[in-house]
Amino acid sequence: MLVVDSSVWIDFFNDADHPSVELLDQLLAHGEVRIVVPDLVLFEVLRGFRLESELRQARRLLESLSIEPAGGEELALAAVQHYRSLRAQGFTVRSGIDVLVAAYCIENDYALLHRDRDFD
């Protein structure tokens, strides 16, 4: 299973020319990999649309995939541990949501497609 981070979805909906967007296009066209959309990613992606028509179109596509809840106490505590470990190693994570998404992928053994240096 694969989680696609908001960094890729945003580029996808903006028709950006990038290998991660091309890969997502192929995955959506062929349906060979189950794409999971954590609710946190759903929020990050949909909050950026200005036009209602674009929001509806994006929502339809994302809701056609597997939307899963990504919150809860257990995940939050796992994310705290990951965050603290990264800080102890000298890494600064810019987004708390990115830590939650990463913890969600780790806890569920999901791959992550991203364009965000927080995940590197």
Functional labels for PLM-detected ranges:
Residues 21, 42, 55-58, 76-80:
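A general structural signal for well-ordered alpha-helical segments in protein cores
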Residues 67-115:
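Active-site neighborhoods of divalent-metal-dependent phosphate/nucleic-acid chemistry enzymes
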Residues 11, 45, 87-89:
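Short, contiguous strand/loop micro-motifs
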Residues 44-48, 66:
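Helix-loop "lid/cap" segments that line or gate small-molecule binding pockets
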Residues 6, 39, 97-99:
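Conserved glycosyltransferase catalytic-site signature
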Residues 9-10, 42, 119:
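A generic structural signal for short hydrophobic patches within well-formed alpha-helices
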Residues 1-37, 47-60:
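Short, well-structured N-terminal submotif of metal-dependent ribonuclease cores
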